[in-house]
């Protein structure tokens, strides 16, 4: 078990220590579940009453919340960001093996960097290139001439198709498929004719992709995911989509083909975005958004209907379905009033 003295932790986090620096911290936990030896954090002053009840040995908080804290504290400007760094230091995720499993199947002309780890039953095909420190989990498939940058980790059962390019220090969760065929077909008198997808997928550095997400290869040009992008679980990204640097995509999002999303965007969960259009930089789409037109101005956009009691929702739906007729009747009343 990893442990660290509170004063040493304060130094690493650039935090101001209040209380006993000799306390030994062995883990991080939420305010209500933390026990002796663990550290927690308070990032929202609305929950400061929990400070009186927590069993944590120390709390990360702001100067404004310090008077309400009854245990040792680390004072910082941004407790949530500090929590992220603290969790990295106290991470309990198992470290990967540092060898190549005997059951792994590796093509003779695949290129492996230094300190590469490959799990049981993984397959590395001809011409694939793995950079230094790459971790390939059990059951993964890396296709012909794929390239994976240094320090990238694939959890178990990830599929990387031929010629896909992953940057450095990426993290791909289990079940994700990158580089499968895009949904491309031509119609010949009612019969669908498959269009081979001749592009690939190019993913930048420090990209994280959640479990069971699918990213299709391009039809002619490539599907491109920029540097620092984070994508949640069970998203579908169609062929030729381009996502700009540091954009965040929450779970269950569907992006149609040839969509271009700018930098620093945030796409809420279960949103659906039309293809063959652009969304500019610094756009936030709230959850369940349906984006049918280009967005040219930064800002926050919404289209979902918030939760209502069923009886109220039924009335709202009826009004929406009859909005044209209601509008006509309202205009008729306005004309009568104007003529009085």
UniProtKB/Swiss-Prot annotation:
Organism encoding this protein: Pectobacterium atrosepticum (strain SCRI 1043 / ATCC BAA-672)
Active site: 239 (proton acceptor)
Gene Ontology annotations of biological process type: lipid A biosynthetic process
Record keywords: Acyltransferase, Lipid A biosynthesis, Lipid biosynthesis, Lipid metabolism, Repeat, Transferase
Reaction(s) the record says it catalyses: a UDP-3-O-[(3R)-3-hydroxyacyl]-alpha-D-glucosamine + a (3R)-hydroxyacyl-[ACP] = a UDP-2-N,3-O-bis[(3R)-3-hydroxyacyl]-alpha-D-glucosamine + holo-[ACP] + H(+); UDP-3-O-[(3R)-3-hydroxytetradecanoyl]-alpha-D-glucosamine + (3R)-hydroxytetradecanoyl-[ACP] = UDP-2-N,3-O-bis[(3R)-3-hydroxytetradecanoyl]-alpha-D-glucosamine + holo-[ACP] + H(+)
Protein's UniProt keywords contain Transferase: yes
Key word NAD present: no
Family matches, as InterPro entries: Hexapep, Hexapep_transf_CS, LpxD, Trimer_LpxA-like_sf, UDP_GlcNAc_AcTrfase_non-rep
This protein's pathway: Glycolipid biosynthesis; lipid IV(A) biosynthesis; lipid IV(A) from (3R)-3-hydroxytetradecanoyl-[acyl-carrier-protein] and UDP-N-acetyl-alpha-D-glucosamine: step 3/6
NCBIfam families reported for this sequence: lipid_A_lpxD, PRK00892.1
A Pfam short name: LpxD
Family label: Belongs to the transferase hexapeptide repeat family. LpxD subfamily.
GO MF annotation terms: N-acyltransferase activity; UDP-3-O-(R-3-hydroxymyristoyl)-glucosamine N-acyltransferase activity
Cellular component aspect of the GO annotation: membrane
Subunit structure: Homotrimer.
Descriptive protein name: UDP-3-O-(3-hydroxymyristoyl)glucosamine N-acyltransferase
EC nos: 2.3.1.191
Enzyme class: transferase
CDD domains: LbH_LpxD
Function: Catalyzes the N-acylation of UDP-3-O-(hydroxytetradecanoyl)glucosamine using 3-hydroxytetradecanoyl-ACP as the acyl donor. Is involved in the biosynthesis of lipid A, a phosphorylated glycolipid that anchors the lipopolysaccharide to the outer membrane of the cell.
